[in-house]
């Protein structure tokens, strides 16, 4: 089984924003979720492109057909936009992780970062909201991007062979008479993102609760995202994503052999290499690779820059459209592949990364 920690984001905003979760809380934390996102009986709430809720009415099959047609085009635009955002995030995150050390790996989860920032964008206004939308959804409107993001997150497969779990939460400091959260914002994130809402004193018990619940939501893959809560923090938004999938066709023992894996700096290390033959070949200018299927329709994608081109150089020239088209246009050329068994972990503060974006 291949286990991938998709990621957790704790993003401290201007007023100390960020947060988390659902059971096993200390006695100082209060579940406020039931107070938000409610609607009167007989009303149907829909989330608009800007994340606001409103009543939806049946406008007939013609409008529905047009909506589905438009959604197809919007979703395609989102796929390109999301890929570009992902590459932008990886490039800037890698710069922070490397910090002059080429031997370090970088793991980021664009979906987790995007969801947490989308919740923050929902509560923003004016230039801040516009700028956040431009970063999150390059090349398309933030309203359309937000709509598709919510639909995709709710439709991703979650089954025995491929577990996908996402948790969104808002924590509000209750021991603060100065800060009062906007109820419309809390209603929106509860309705649009199924976020839970908690009140807490923002002391050491709150810090433990957040870490404990992130660990729970990620099946133990992430055990800590906070070591302390700043005095000025008044609200937390936290998104946690966990992905745990099996290969559609597992490697058998005869396909796993000891081999030497060479890193970018030329150093070699002994690894267990998983060999296979595939017809899902990927090629682009200055790189080639392959796809391999997980269960439930998920794919693992590996790309290798051509010899003589560093990973940083390749990432700098790669754009979302090229990357997306490469994956869409895989060809059935038979190739032999070797993939090392590996684990990876990245711990980084995203403040500088997001500022660079």
Map each language-model feature to its residues:
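Short amphipathic beta-strand starts and helix->beta connectors
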Residues: 95-103, 285-287, 320-323
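Short Gly/aromatic-enriched secondary-structure transition segments
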Residues: 132-136, 251-258, 313-321
């Amino acid at each position: 089984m291949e286990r991938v920690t998709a990621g957790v984001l704790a993003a401290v905003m201007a007023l100390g924003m960020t947060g988390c979760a659902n059971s096993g809380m200390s006695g100082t934390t209060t579940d406020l979720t039931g107070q938000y996102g409610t609607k009167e009986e007989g009303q149907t709430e829909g989330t608009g492109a800007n994340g606001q809720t409103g009543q939806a009415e049946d406008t007939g099959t013609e409008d529905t057909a047009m909506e589905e047609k438009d959604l197809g085009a919007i979703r395609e635009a989102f796929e390109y936009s999301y890929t570009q955002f992902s590459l932008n995030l990886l490039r800037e995150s890698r710069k922070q992780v490397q910090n002059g050390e080429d031997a370090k790996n970088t793991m980021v989860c664009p979906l987790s970062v995007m969801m947490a920032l989308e919740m923050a964008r929902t509560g923003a206004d004016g230039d801040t909201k516009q700028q956040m939308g431009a970063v999150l959804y390059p090349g398309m409107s933030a309203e359309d991007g937000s709509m598709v993001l919510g639909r995709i997150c709710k439709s991703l497969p979650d089954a025995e062979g491929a577990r996908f779990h996402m948790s969104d939460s808002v924590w509000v400091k209750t021991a603060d008479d100065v800060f009062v959260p906007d109820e419309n914002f809390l209603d929106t994130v509860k309705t649009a993102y199924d976020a839970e809402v908690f009140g807490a004193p923002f002391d050491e018990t709150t810090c433990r609760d957040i870490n404990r619940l992130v660990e729970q939501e990620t099946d133990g893959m992430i055990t800590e995202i906070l070591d302390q809560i700043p005095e000025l923090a008044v609200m937390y938004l936290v998104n946690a994503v966990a992905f745990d999938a099996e290969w559609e066709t597992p490697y058998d023992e005869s396909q796993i052999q000891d081999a030497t894996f060479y890193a970018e700096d030329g150093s070699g290390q002994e690894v267990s290499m998983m060999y296979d033959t595939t017809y899902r070949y990927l090629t682009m200018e200055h790189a080639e690779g392959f796809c391999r299927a997980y269960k439930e329709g998920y794919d693992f994608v590996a790309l290798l820059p051509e010899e003589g081109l560093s990973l940083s150089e390749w990432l700098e020239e790669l754009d979302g459209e090229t990357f997306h088209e490469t994956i869409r246009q895989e060809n059935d050329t038979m190739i032999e592949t070797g993939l090392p068994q590996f684990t990876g972990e990245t711990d980084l503060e995203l403040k500088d990364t997001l500022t660079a974006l």
